[in-house]
Structure formats: structure tokens, C-alpha cells
Amino acid sequence: VRFKGSDYKKGELVVKKNTIIQPNHILAFKSLGIKNIKVKKKINILFFSTGNEISNSDNVPDWKVRNSNNHYIKNLDQNFLFNFKNGGILRDNHEKLFKSKITKMLKSNTDIIITSGAVSAGKFDFVPSVIKSFQLSNYFKSVAIRPGKPILFAKIRGKQKAIFGLPGNPMSSAACFRFFVYPYIQYIFGLNEEKPF
């Protein structure tokens, strides 16, 4: 026998503001007959892999690598509050194409551009120079961590638009997403800061 009000009492808080909705919250909403709640819309992320060596094929020659970073970030979209759009692969000579993609992003509903690779100091690492050609309100490149040292972050002046340049190495890219991109997404949503481990 369950008595009326044994799950929740009248006026009791069900979910705090700035909480990521989880299945247990949906269970509570349905049990209480709550049909509508106010939520913030997901942010939109546009992702580019970079480099002549990147391949979407499963069978790759020795000098190429599989496009794993694209699939990793794509499959985080349900957990990390964003819509993922694959922008494709920017090859080593695609500086102008990348610049045009950023220009289009400024007029679109894209909130964040993420690139993977081409952020270090190599001959074909064009991402930093292209990004710095725009007017920026915030910018940093390289941090004292491993893996992930060559990460880049930029915010376009006068716009709520950001660009992250992640390293091409899969482990470095995953680490930088977790410790830089994800906290930025939390900041956008006004979520509480994570507690240290």
C-alpha cells in the first residue's frame, strides 16, 4: 500500500534549476503528471578533422590514420548536451576553406567549432593562423599538460561563438575535450562546477 504524497509532498522540489535532465528525472515528471518543463536548448557543434593523412575508410595504408576523433565526439552528443554536425576533413591546403567555414559559422546557429589536428607548429598546421585572422575577444594556445599540450581556444569578439583546436592524437583530443570543451559547455549552461575527484 502506497499512501498519497509518499513519493513527493506538495510544494517539494523535484529538480533543481541548472540540472542536467536524467532518466530518473523523467520518471518523476511522468509519475507526477508534469508534461512541460522549461529547458535550455542544446548548443550546436561543428566538427572538422584535419590533415591529408586522415581517412574515413576502415582499410587504410600505412601513411594514413582512421578518422577516430570525429566518431568519438559525435557519440558524446547525448551525454554532453550538444548537437553534433560533421564538417568533414580539411586537407593540408584548405586554409581558405577553413576561413570561409568560420565566416559562415558567424552567421549560423553554430555555437562552437571544434577542429582536430593542425594546431601545433608544423608546416601544415594552419588552424592557429586562420583563427587569429579574425577579431577575437579571448585566445590561448598551448597548456602545460600531457596529453593535450597544443590545444587552442578562441572566442570571436562581439559574438557568442567559440573555436577549440584540439590535437590530432586521439588520446590528446579526448583529454582536451573532457577538460576544456566540456567545462566550457557547462559554463554556457550555467551548470555547477564539477567537484574535484
Regions found by a protein language model. Give the residues of each.
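A general structural motif
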Residues: K64-N69, R91-F98, S142-I151
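Short beta-strand segments
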Residues: K16, F47-T50, T115-S116, A144, ...
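Flexible glycine/proline-rich
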Residues: Y8, V130-F197
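Short glycine/serine/threonine-rich phosphate/pyrophosphate-binding segments
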Residues: P23-N24, N56-S57, A121-D125, A174
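Short, glycine/charged-enriched hinge/interface segments at domain edges or termini
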Residues: V1-G87
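N-terminal small/polar loop signature for handling phosphorylated ligands or for N-terminal nucleophile
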Residues: H71-Q135
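Short glycine-rich anion-binding loops that position phosphate/pyrophosphate groups of nucleotides
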Residues: N52-E53, A118-F124, G168-P170
